[in-house]
Amino acid sequence: MAGNTIGQLFRVTTFGESHGIALGCIIDGCPPGLSLTEKDMQHDLDRRRPGTSKYTTQRREADEVKILSGVFEGQTTGTSIGLLIENTDQRSKDYSNIQDLFRPGHADYTYHQKYGVRDYRGGGRSSARETAMRVAAGAVAKKYLKQIHGIEVRAYLSQMGAVKIDKVDWEQIEQNAFFCPDADKVDAFDELIRKLKKEGDSIGAKLTVVASNVPVGLGEPVFDRLDADVAHSLMSINAVKGVEIGDGFEVIEQRGSQHRDEMTLDGFKTNHAGGILGGISSGQNIVAHIALKPTSSITVPGETITSKGESAEVITKGRHDPCVGIRAVPIAEAMLAITLMDHLLRHRGQNADVVTTTPKI
Amino acid sequence: MAGNTIGQLFRVTTFGESHGIALGCIIDGCPPGLSLTEKDMQHDLDRRRPGTSKYTTQRREADEVKILSGVFEGQTTGTSIGLLIENTDQRSKDYSNIQDLFRPGHADYTYHQKYGVRDYRGGGRSSARETAMRVAAGAVAKKYLKQIHGIEVRAYLSQMGAVKIDKVDWEQIEQNAFFCPDADKVDAFDELIRKLKKEGDSIGAKLTVVASNVPVGLGEPVFDRLDADVAHSLMSINAVKGVEIGDGFEVIEQRGSQHRDEMTLDGFKTNHAGGILGGISSGQNIVAHIALKPTSSITVPGETITSKGESAEVITKGRHDPCVGIRAVPIAEAMLAITLMDHLLRHRGQNADVVTTTPKI
Amino acid sequence: MAGNTIGQLFRVTTFGESHGIALGCIIDGCPPGLSLTEKDMQHDLDRRRPGTSKYTTQRREADEVKILSGVFEGQTTGTSIGLLIENTDQRSKDYSNIQDLFRPGHADYTYHQKYGVRDYRGGGRSSARETAMRVAAGAVAKKYLKQIHGIEVRAYLSQMGAVKIDKVDWEQIEQNAFFCPDADKVDAFDELIRKLKKEGDSIGAKLTVVASNVPVGLGEPVFDRLDADVAHSLMSINAVKGVEIGDGFEVIEQRGSQHRDEMTLDGFKTNHAGGILGGISSGQNIVAHIALKPTSSITVPGETITSKGESAEVITKGRHDPCVGIRAVPIAEAMLAITLMDHLLRHRGQNADVVTTTPKI
Amino acid sequence: MAGNTIGQLFRVTTFGESHGIALGCIIDGCPPGLSLTEKDMQHDLDRRRPGTSKYTTQRREADEVKILSGVFEGQTTGTSIGLLIENTDQRSKDYSNIQDLFRPGHADYTYHQKYGVRDYRGGGRSSARETAMRVAAGAVAKKYLKQIHGIEVRAYLSQMGAVKIDKVDWEQIEQNAFFCPDADKVDAFDELIRKLKKEGDSIGAKLTVVASNVPVGLGEPVFDRLDADVAHSLMSINAVKGVEIGDGFEVIEQRGSQHRDEMTLDGFKTNHAGGILGGISSGQNIVAHIALKPTSSITVPGETITSKGESAEVITKGRHDPCVGIRAVPIAEAMLAITLMDHLLRHRGQNADVVTTTPKI
């Protein structure tokens, strides 16, 4: 209830600050019998890891995850899985200059007022470094979903600043440092990032997350609709300011005759709904889009105040991404996977007895 | 966990189908000592109620709510509050024609596949009629927030189809049937609705919800951020396909130097963030936008299938809104109020000891 | 979280005061496809109902339960089930004499101090009248457990005051007003009750609850062990002051060589454990005992204080049971059934994939 | 929901197996501003630690806890606290002899059937080694309760086998290896343990846990009564088979005139209720008793079966306590402290507005 847990049956609880000793999480409720090693998580951790490309922060973290429990002889046992990543590059530098400073666009001011104290080193708990554990836990969900149910969860960068992709070639996504599915836009992204670096500024981004081969029936009426829970889990990612399911905000100008996805015996004719009807998966691809704000960690000077009630100017030096949206791709995948996994377990908990002869389309 | 509950400390659990005997809800965790009568809820219920204007469905429901428990001598007692609304206009008409039909854009197919059985009368549990109880519960939250903490939660229609409002005059909202804050757009909305009625079609809408006078500090890191929980509660409203906090999807093209809300001793200079930083309320107005899809209950014929695996044509006759977004205004207010109320109680549960001398801006 | 809900996947939330308009509950998470009518609940409600025998309170309540939602054409639909029982015999008598009085052994003082206000009529929310809804919800669980899984949950009175039963004849339990499985003790119980009535006093009781045909595997390590959750649900019944699983407090003087239930290929040789090992059901009968205190609603004068800070004498007149333990028999069954049902759904949520070739004994 | 979490606002989630790499836990919801170091936990960990006395198992574990997050400059920050204890004495011995063996009285059979796989080394997750993290988390709760609210939680051994204590001298408890408050019984306990060691057998025990200076008002009607949640948390301790609140099972033979705790302006005259009325703390001492079964890890040969469906004989060699109840003293304190802490936060979450002029007695 204090917010560091997500999920009901597949539950992930995390801890750890940006410049603390370690990050960790506990996965509770993972089905037993799943083969699992650190390698299964390391791939996605590496995709999210800082310092892997010139486009992202140069902080060097190995992000090596260790499984501390819940796996025996290479298989999950059904008991709680403890995961740990040690922080190796905290750089115990002097933080006295930002100790009292409320950086605009950051959580400094709100954490300070909420708790009275805060770990000001690198944002403490509010740092996006926390998302490493989401990616680790998400990798477990992704493996289970893929291996046992054939469900695949993938994401890509669909827009950065004014540059939008024009096509989706799944093969391209891992071929460039932007998780960009349109090879023709890679240069434009590259150019934009260079420009921003030079100017010491940052830019927002749009990501698209897709889950394919999802069975019909996941999601609970009326508050825990699948789309509501997906909105929750995606909006919980640092910097996300908007979530769309399917056509999202485009529906405002659509007609009902245009939006409804007509059905034939061969399947749905369209997927404006993004794979969710009445809060329950329809069997079509789950499609979501998220908007990530430009980071406020920039060198353009800004006005702010201190915890002592003084005016101040802020410049955030250090190792920061001009576009935090890029590295959010594996995070978005992780969050969607965790939510689908949770709903899959919840669905069969209640409905394992159901037998229906109606054909699924 | 089965989805009919929202909130942790201020918990709302609902039941009821469109054409069942009654709708009801239990509010658990309401602070004691709040003066409360049915009238406090009836105003918002009437705002949501069908049949109150020519622009909305003509189903006639009194929507008279009864308090069954939890209130004694006009005051909440701190124990669970039972609320009931009897369905009076179910019109026990013949539903055999849609019994086997999966209406496109509706939850018919997904409920059927999930549960094996479904109450097909008027959508059963998936009907927006369910939202009446949200409004009733939300009215309790709104009263507490306003009376004890001075927090106000209001919403309005900001777009319908291609027609957007140009200004927000709070006084106007209750002066027209569209909850439109821009008097100059009322005629355009009216015209659009008439056109749609004639064509038997429907249209999407955009709503804006604003909470003012919210204290700094509400929201929990890292998964139960206030924005994540607001996204969840707003996305759980029928027909919502997108949620934005603050600038929402506009952030994609913003620069960090532009988006970050700089702070001065007189307060924040802007509110691009929508009143939430790091998942915690900043003391600025909470601002959210939602996109509602056009209803699929239209008379334009559409293609679909039946539970027996046959092709079929569907035309939805009956008493339906051409724009379901209009009546969603009080619902959106209710959901935001419930979420804020919950977080207010959660915040003080953990942090009641906190004393900070840092000035709030 | 505010306490009026029990269960995770099979969730029961209740409302209602002793002298309010109605009692109600919402069952969320019931599997779909279960045939269910009011009759299925009425039998247990009648067993718990006041006024049915000369041994229990003479308050006359029909306790007629109405299903308001979640059941369609005689079958559960998987959506939330709303239940309602109207209070018909509130007797709007004058309560001004106890309005300010804190009756010893009751919740008057604690509710008053916790909430600042309380519904003093008949104990309000703290009255055992609240348990009617537990019995109704428990009947749904009992039906599902029996019909789909063959699990049976039954209870009996095993001791009242110093009178203990010597044998358990399941056929006898419904043959007498005490739910006593030992026909030879019925007269002694009858005599004890008569004596207490004459003296205006009350007595404690011990109940035994047994679930048979429970599959191996229900219960979650480490905090939500089946025994821990059973202890929770049984201790939540009014007047319960102790819970034992299996041999309970007798284990203090047992040797390990005596207590451990040895296993053979024909099954366990004994059942000291009460059917739970390591918090997980073993496939043996689940056996629990509970101790219920003597009610404080007696006519023997007692010393107390008022909410105004004055000394006072209290005598509780009215329609009260000399032994509240008797009517608790169906309540205990209901609580055990609700807990087993919840764990059954939770177990299959996580472990539906498990295939083991090891024989179950 | 998968069982490795306890509490709602003060939440403790644990992981770790007996012979795994490490044990850990996450405390979520701890109020900020509490001074906290490893030392605050180490004292209780040492009290629970194996190998500290000749009466308990000789496994040597340093049980050194490390704080990984949530504490900054010696103070809790309000964010999740990560704790870790590395297993140092796993003794990677050969477990092939018990790999297929279901030890009677243990969780081997039930875990195997539930999950299909299990970590058989030393009981894996079902080992009481898991309780180290409960003690660590409990120490945080104990410190907060004591320092901020003056609440003290203490426990002692009240019976082992047939030997019962006759008096409670709080000063004595830490003066002997049995946590025995009656100096005159220490020799009898010592003799009993020696005898059992010689015979290779074990014995049960009874513990008493007391919380003093608890404010009136903690606990939630109707399912999350304080006594119900205490029963849950105490019954979740390994080997516990019974829980009593106040007079517990003695109430069966009590009269109402005897049991009800009469009230005067100077306070309650007695405390039969154990400090809880109607599920809510009364301001008196909270008193609970628990019964712990004799461990089945004994050298007396016993009959059992294997996972292959064969008969077998079992003798448990190794480093085991003849009376596991002794070391459960700090565990029982921890569990009661966690539950009180949770309810204290929950209470003020809902009821922080309450002002009552009625004097507390």
From Swiss-Prot, chains A, B, C, D:
Q: Where does this protein hold FMN?
A: R125, S126, S127, N238, A239, G278, K293, P294, T295, S296, S297, R319
Q: Would the keyword NADP be found if you checked this record's keyword annotation?
A: yes
A GO biological process held by the record: amino acid biosynthetic process
Which Pfam families would you find in this protein's record?
Chorismate_synt (PF01264)
Q: Which reaction does it catalyse?
A: 5-O-(1-carboxyvinyl)-3-phosphoshikimate = chorismate + phosphate
Cellular component (GO) terms are: cytosol
The cofactor note reads: Reduced FMN (FMNH(2)).
Compositionally biased spans, kind Basic and acidic residues: 38-49
Q: What does this protein do?
A: This reaction introduces a second double bond into the aromatic ring system.
Listed name of the protein = Chorismate synthase
What is the organism field in this record?
Answer: Photobacterium profundum (strain SS9)
